[in-house]
Curated annotation (Swiss-Prot):
The gene is rpsC. PANTHER family: 30S/40S RIBOSOMAL PROTEIN S3, SMALL RIBOSOMAL SUBUNIT PROTEIN US3C. The lineage of its organism: Bacteria, Pseudomonadati, Pseudomonadota, Gammaproteobacteria, Oceanospirillales. Pfam families: KH_2, Ribosomal_S3_C. HAMAP family: Ribosomal_uS3_B. Binds the lower part of the 30S subunit head. Binds mRNA in the 70S ribosome, positioning it for translation. Keywords: Ribonucleoprotein, Ribosomal protein, RNA-binding, rRNA-binding. This is Small ribosomal subunit protein uS3.
């Protein structure tokens, strides 16, 4: 009754790709998975001010490739690339293999569920009224072309004695349509009254080409831009 499956999990292999891309030998899967979780926790803690949206981990033969999706790549890279070099060394030490770090910029953070959730949590921790924070985030997303967005808050909203759940939605968020590109994220706001949980669903349109279309777009985004020929 009223229980909802994780929108990302149900779409894996249909219109969503895995965040960890590798195969493990027999008996090594648990260690690699635990190592992935440790690396993610380390990166999220180290880059908590860099507006990190997603971290993808790939493990080709005897090395690793980590792609960090962020709205503020300058903070991740640091002055003359010093921060990203230090990050690469630390992660390589944790994983025990050479690591290559890619930085991808999120051009529209208002349409990224993880960044929207972080933004709402930041406002709640600064004591902005929760309804105002929700409404502002929803309006920004719709203004930039989202098909629909829903934000749900749970906890002692406004310092109330009894915890409750409130949500706000604009547009359409078709959770039952598997070809729908639903970006889903959760985050926690630590306020003086306690923890407030934030959930965000962003509908970005339908993907008719399936997972192949998603992977083709990812490769296109990662490909280096062609060099422009100078005018004579």
């Amino acid at each position: 009754m009223g229980q909802k499956v994780n929108p990302t999990g149900i779409r894996l292999g249909i219109v969503k790709d895995h965040r960890s891309v590798w195969y493990a030998e027999r008996g090594a899967y648990a260690d690699k998975l635990n190592n992935d979780l440790e690396v993610r926790r380390f990166l999220e803690q180290r880059l908590k001010n860099a507006s990190v949206s997603d971290i993808t981990i790939e493990r080709p033969a005897n090395n690793a490739r980590i792609t960090i999706h962020t709205a503020r790549p300058g903070i991740v890279i640091g002055k003359k690339g010093e921060d990203v070099d230090r990050l690469r060394r630390d992660v390589s030490e944790m994983m025990g293999v050479p690591v290559h770090v890619n930085i991808e910029e999120v051009r529209k953070p208002e349409l990224d569920a993880q960044l929207v959730a972080q933004n709402v949590c930041g406002q709640l921790e600064r004591r902005v009224m929760f309804r105002r924070a929700m409404k502002r985030a929803v309006q920004n997303a719709m203004r930039l072309g989202a098909g629909g967005i829903k934000i749900q808050l749970s906890g002692r909203l406004g310092g109330a004695e009894i915890a409750r759940t409130e949500w706000y939605r604009e547009g359409r968020v078709p959770l039952h349509t598997l070809r729908a590109d639903i970006d889903y994220a959760t985050y926690e706001a630590h306020t003086t009254y306690g923890v407030i949980g934030v959930k965000v669903w962003v509908f970005k349109g339908e993907i008719l080409g399936g997972i192949e279309e998603v992977r083709a777009k990812q490769k296109q985004a990662q490909a280096p831009a062609p060099k422009k020929k100078g005018s004579r």
